């Protein structure tokens, strides 16, 4: 049976790193000195304790600082992320994700509506630009080469104290006839999260999401509009999509045309702003390496293992999001103050698809 503490310590040992003080407690909700009781009175209690450990480990592992480590382990030619991915597979830890179960009775009680009235200036007063971008993609509905977006910030918690996050975007891929669990990564200064973290986060959310609720829901605006599409058909199949920016550019590098957002300063949302230097996102860097070299072969193997143990997971897609400055489509009419000079429509480009072999 899985022991969360022992599993995490083993992974840390593999990358030559000590578990930091209070890390187990703050990330997994488990004290470092906790000892599993081998004298449980009933098998049922043991099973319940084991499931608690599974939830602690699998649902929260993507939050650990080690999955975002970049570069090489001291004194070796091995990337941190590669050794972590390899250990998850070789020690069968990846199988623990397969045991996660949804806990929220209704994911679609948020009232999200494609046509809700929005003021672009009020929307942009927040520094949480990734969430704002998710909303803008939701309001756009169809994103070329990504799919039809029917919800954003989909909640997974059953109660407030649950540690689970929210799915950035839910989409429908009409080409491959599957739902898309979309993990969006964006920062105006360039996102620094590793692909390992992105994949584990997306997979955790997939397991904690009750996909059958899409079919049973009767009230959610996005699902109602999805059902009206001529190429839509309900399915049990899904894909994981890692969606990211290529780079954030200064003006001289074409930022006015290519940056995903220009209203990046909340106190001056009526004017365009740019980063102080052009920065390529970590996801784009690693995706190029995944395609062009064997630098991330253990990540590839981890993705293949995830797909092998999930019969309804068709593929994992790595997708770059782009500003569609040539689009002739009309802007979302529900967004007051939307400007072609300052705001964007979006398109996507799939860089890599890892398919299920099943």
Predicted segments, located by residue:
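Charged, terminal alpha-helix-loop-beta segments
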Residues: 1-358
